[in-house]
């Protein structure tokens, strides 16, 4: 019978495990084919930029070199791996994992951002429901993943502070996505989630932005916000409920989110509560955070026949969304269009409901994306639904011309990327001010954690970055825990709580440093539990904004 491990050896083993543990959560990203046309693969060839391992399920198969290029097919539910010499390496039904400790895993022939696609973390080949096909999944730490997201979602010329704001928004989005598209992965690598092109597209400045916001998310109350963002709001951001439907019930408008509310770039902007005010705003170019965007203001034109053809071509497909009433079947004609009638707008002037009036029916179209995809111009959707229409008729009352005046690109909810760039570079605003403009009533903090006295729980570690070396521990001490032990940057500390007050705020600044900090929290030894997060404070993080 083996001797029990000594306490010192247990501690050594624990330290080794912790040193090799991820500094941030692991997430799973579905990798699409070229042009993101599909997330189902039939054939793929894998290589690496350094030595790598292959695993059959959990079983290691061996170590391979950069000269070893492996082709994978799925035949009769089995994965078959063949090297360049035609030798079969594995024939198995288990998922296959490729891992390189010091290099990247590449997918031969796959391009991202015009360069070969290579990835940090692991590449996993997993079976899917389609016969002889599979998914490719990149399992990767959140902080490493963001390096491949931020420069592809926002140009690095927008500057460090805007990139830091984008980093926080993207971190929130992957940790709390609106929709999980597939049980095999959390997000995909396209605009269906957020654009992720892998390691070959990383940039020095965007990597710095990720580093200088490490571990930081935006919270409303105790929850991660849904950090929606788009290219260009057009001078007004829009409320969530006026743009998105409920994921489960499809109800529109959906339930509101108190941190995603319509807001003008400047307080002096007049409320867009009439058609005349909407027209005046989007036909003009007021001073705006978005003014440098090529889509800040735009125009589109159709002849009467062009608008007829566009609506007829798109209405059946858009009817499948459930947001056109009455629905139109494929091949069904809609009649001659007489007018486009705006029935309802959001606070930014965004069209929520549009009536397509024809000579034999009135079709009610809801939701900005459906409206944009219905009213295509030269085959392309409208940049946004922040739009007003001018319509001209001939002597017989027939619609002969439509002109659209619009502003913005995308849904316009939450952070405007062009707006963030302007705020950071032109107005010299720090990232937290940018975020707090677009997301109302938030705090910037680490992800909330719960510490309990359950036997299977021992420690929780959080790593985060603070430029000022200042932060407070925000605690919900519902069960009146007296204290917990912690290790802050390798120094042991007892954190005591005021049990007379359920909510505690404890200044950690004296134990922190400017830059990266790591805190290991030990679970309470006695029954009970607490929840808490670490909130950034200080001039650079909160910009003297004490809201």
Which residue ranges define each predicted feature?
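Conserved, single-site charged/polar hotspot
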Residues: 1-472, 477-506, 510, 514-547
């Amino acid at each position: 019978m083996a001797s029990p491990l000594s306490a010192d050896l247990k501690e050594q083993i624990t330290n080794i495990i912790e040193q090799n543990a991820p500094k941030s959560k692991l997430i799973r990203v579905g990798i699409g084919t070229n042009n993101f046309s599909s997330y189902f693969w039939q054939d793929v060839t894998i290589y690496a930029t350094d030595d790598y391992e292959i695993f059959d399920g959990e079983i290691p198969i061996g170590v391979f070199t950069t000269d070893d290029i492996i082709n994978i097919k799925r035949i009769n539910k089995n994965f078959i791996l063949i090297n360049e010499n035609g030798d079969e390496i594995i024939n198995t039904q288990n998922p296959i994992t490729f891992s390189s400790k010091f290099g990247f895993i590449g997918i031969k022939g796959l391009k991202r951002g015009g360069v070969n696609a290579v990835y940090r973390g692991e590449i996993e080949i997993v079976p899917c429901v389609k016969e002889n096909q599979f998914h490719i999944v990149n399992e990767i730490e959140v902080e490493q993943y963001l390096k491949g997201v931020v420069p592809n979602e926002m140009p690095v010329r927008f500057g460090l502070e805007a990139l830091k704001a984008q980093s926080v928004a993207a971190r929130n989005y992957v940790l709390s996505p609106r929709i999980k598209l597939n049980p095999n992965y959390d997000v995909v690598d396209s605009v269906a989630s957020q654009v992720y092109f892998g390691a070959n597209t990383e940039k020095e400045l965007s990597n710095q932005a990720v580093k200088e916001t490490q571990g930081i998310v935006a919270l409303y109350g105790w929850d991660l916000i849904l950090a929606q963002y788009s290219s260009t709001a057009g001078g007004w951001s829009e409320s969530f409920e006026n743009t998105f439907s409920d994921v489960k019930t499809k109800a529109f408008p959906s339930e509101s989110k108190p941190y995603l509310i319509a807001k003008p770039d400047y307080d002096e902007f007049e409320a867009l509560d009439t058609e005349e005010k909407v027209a005046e705003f989007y036909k003009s170019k007021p001073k705006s955070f978005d003014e440098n965007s090529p889509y800040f203001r735009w125009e589109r034109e159709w002849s009467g026949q062009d608008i007829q053809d566009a609506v007829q071509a798109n209405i059946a497909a858009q009817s499948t969304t459930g947001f056109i009433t009455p629905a139109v079947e494929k091949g069904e004609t809609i009649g001659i269009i007489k007018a486009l009638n705006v029935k309802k707008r959001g606070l930014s002037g965004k069209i929520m409901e549009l009536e397509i009036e024809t000579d034999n029916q009135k079709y009610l179209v809801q939701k900005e994306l459906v409206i944009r995809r219905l009213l295509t111009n030269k085959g392309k959707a409208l940049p946004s639904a922040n739009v007003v229409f001018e319509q001209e008729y001939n002597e017989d009352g027939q619609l002969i011309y439509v002109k659209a005046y619009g502003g913005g690109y995308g849904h316009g909810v939450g952070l405007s990327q062009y707006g963030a760039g302007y705020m950071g570079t032109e107005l010299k605003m720090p990232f937290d001010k940018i975020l707090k403009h677009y997301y109302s009533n938030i705090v910037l903090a680490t992800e909330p954690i719960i510490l309990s006295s359950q036997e299977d729980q021992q420690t929780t570690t959080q790593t985060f970055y603070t430029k000022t070396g200042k932060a407070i521990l925000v605690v919900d001490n519902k069960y009146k825990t007296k204290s917990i032990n912690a290790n802050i940057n390798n120094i042991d500390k007892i954190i005591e709580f005021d049990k007379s007050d359920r909510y505690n705020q404890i200044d950690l600044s004296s134990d922190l440093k400017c830059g990266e900090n790591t805190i290991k929290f030990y679970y309470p030894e006695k029954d009970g539990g607490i929840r808490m997060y670490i909130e950034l404070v200080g001039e650079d993080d909160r910009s003297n904004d004490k809201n």
